[in-house]
Amino acid sequence: LAEKLQRERAAETGAGIMNYKVVMAYDGSRYNGWQKQGNTDKTIQGKLEQILFKMTGEEIEVHGSGRTDAGVHARGQVANFHIDWKKLEVQEKRELEKNAGNQAGQGCKREKCGGKKTPDQIMEYINEYLPEDIAVLSCEVAPERFHSRLSAVRKTYCYQLEMGPKKDVFQRNYYYGLGERLDVSAMKAAAGLLTGTHDFKSFCGNKKMKKSTVRTIEKIEFEQSGSRLHIYFTGNGFLQQMVRILTGTLIEVGQGKCAPDKITRILDAQDRQAAGPSAPAQGLFLVNVGYEDK
């Protein structure tokens, strides 16, 4: 708490480059994922960077804790970005001096001038221009070396399944409608074999992955309410489409297509073809990103 107050005081007293941490929620249904792409503006990162440019007049890169795929949602995505307030202050002063004789409103290239903003003001500004399916939940000054992805020590994802015979048309973008009951006990047994540190190459959607595919899953938890089943995955990091492939494999276990003890052989195979299919994107939520307390 003391360090957080110190960072906020530094921001208020005019420190130059400030690092900001934001927590975001979004409905990924109509977006092509987190990462900005040159051929579309339908990305979460792209929307946020457009608004920061509107606010500062500068190109500001936003770093996300993870690149959620198209159609994937987030309740607790974490991102960070830097703003050089000293630089902006100097630029604004020059622009105002240069355009001293111009009409009101032409002296600054940014829509809203007026110096540095507090974290709350930044959050308010961003939310004013974000579409209704994206929101910044919190904004705070972060340590200089904080990076939303590189500083993360754990993440929790949730996959939502609907096992009822009739699909809920109003929840179709947030649940994978299976239309059949699953053997959850068998799925829990299989999940027990997935926890711990393993080489998850068989559960990686990137066949050209050259970096280590070893990850640690701390726990896999199941919450069932009626015909709805939520599966929570917590680990130190996840490979591309890993949670969706894990879910697809656990579904096959629940359907009786795959014995729980086959999980060990799937891990040992280190072959994507050995695991089950990738579950659809719409059922997946990034729930939480954890960091070391300092």
Protein language model regions, located:
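Structured-RNA-binding interfaces characteristic of tRNA pseudouridine synthases
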Residues: 14-294
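N-terminal amphipathic/basic-hydrophobic helices that include classical n-h-c signal peptides
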Residues: 1-17
